[in-house]
Amino acid sequence: MEEQTKEIQEEKKETPQEEVREEKKEEKKVSVIELIQHFSDIPVEVEVVVGRANKTLGELLAMGIGSVIEIDREPKDLVDIKVNGKLIAKGELVIIDGKIGVKIKEVVKEQR
């Protein structure tokens, strides 16, 4: 019985191949900061959504210069800020040097 126990314990020891795999895993560990720095130059599309409106094709065809499309938001409502189509924040429209900008007011937590 004692011999069987020794055999089982010896079987549990890592083989040389398993030791190499463990060493490679250690080499591959990269800090989150290094990972972010590595990918920080990747371009992403930032989209600001002021509002939406549903119209029929007939209503769209009847529109022309000067037509007004009413959207689903009040002037005081925050706008949606999306990155690559995903809602990440809400903000307020502001004017900066004669151009429109968005001031972030809320960060949207990821929904799971």
UniProtKB/Swiss-Prot annotation:
GO biological process, one term: bacterial-type flagellum-dependent cell motility
Gene Ontology CC: bacterial-type flagellum basal body; plasma membrane
Main location: membrane
Assigned keywords, A-Z: Bacterial flagellum, Cell inner membrane, Cell membrane, Chemotaxis, Flagellar rotation, Membrane
Membrane topology field: Peripheral membrane protein
Subcellular location field: Cell inner membrane; Bacterial flagellum basal body
Alphabetized Pfam families for the sequence: FliMN_C
Similarity comment text for this entry: Belongs to the FliN/MopA/SpaO family.
Function: FliM is one of 2 proteins (FliG, FliN) that might form a switch complex that is proposed to be located at the base of the basal body. This complex interacts with the CheY and CheZ chemotaxis proteins, in addition to contacting components of the motor that determine the direction of flagellar rotation (Potential).
Annotated protein name in UniProt: Flagellar motor switch protein FliN
Source organism per UniProt: Aquifex aeolicus (strain VF5)
